[in-house]
């Protein structure tokens, strides 16, 4: 399940209440954003773990303060967070552009970490 974020406060609450979060900063008018949206939905369905790994979408035109806070200059931009702090996954803290292979690999990595956390490892 993808969390559709409507305010920066809502984003901050998700970041503080969930161990790992993948955030997709997008715009409705952005063709690459539309192209990767189904992939992002599939990754969310496959890897989401309640309170451990969440996938969120932030529309940069509607939640401008969040876009500014994280320095979003291109869409889509994907960022990864652990315990509220931005982190690198597979050596990348940010993925700019619709790159399904890199995004999929990052989701797989976080999904594995989330499963280990649930298992108590």
Curated annotation (Swiss-Prot):
Q: Where is the Thioredoxin domain?
A: 2-112
The answer to whether UniProt assigns keyword Transport to this entry is yes
Task: Return the InterPro entries for the record.
Answer: Thioredoxin-like_sf, Thioredoxin_CS, Thioredoxin_domain
Q: Does the keyword Transport apply?
A: yes
Keywords assigned by UniProt, alphabetized = Allergen, Disulfide bond, Electron transport, Redox-active center, Transport
Show the disulfide pairing: 30-33
Q: What does this protein do?
A: Participates in various redox reactions through the reversible oxidation of its active center dithiol to a disulfide and catalyzes dithiol-disulfide exchange reactions.
Family per record: Belongs to the thioredoxin family.
Protein name from the UniProt record? Thioredoxin-like protein
Organism phylogeny: Eukaryota, Fungi, Dikarya, Ascomycota, Pezizomycotina
């Amino acid at each position: 399940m993808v969390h559709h974020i409507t305010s920066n406060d809502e984003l901050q609450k998700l970041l503080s209440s969930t161990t790992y979060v993948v955030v997709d900063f997008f715009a409705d008018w952005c063709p690459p954003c539309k192209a990767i949206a189904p992939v992002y939905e599939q990754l969310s369905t496959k890897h989401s773990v309640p309170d451990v790994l969440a996938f969120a979408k932030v529309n940069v035109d509607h939640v401008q303060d969040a876009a500014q806070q994280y320095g979003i200059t291109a869409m889509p931009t994907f960022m990864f967070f652990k315990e509220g702090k931005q982190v690198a996954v597979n050596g990348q803290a940010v993925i700019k552009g619709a790159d399904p292979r890199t995004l999929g690999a990052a989701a797989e990595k976080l999904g594995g970490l989330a499963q280990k956390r649930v298992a108590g490892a």
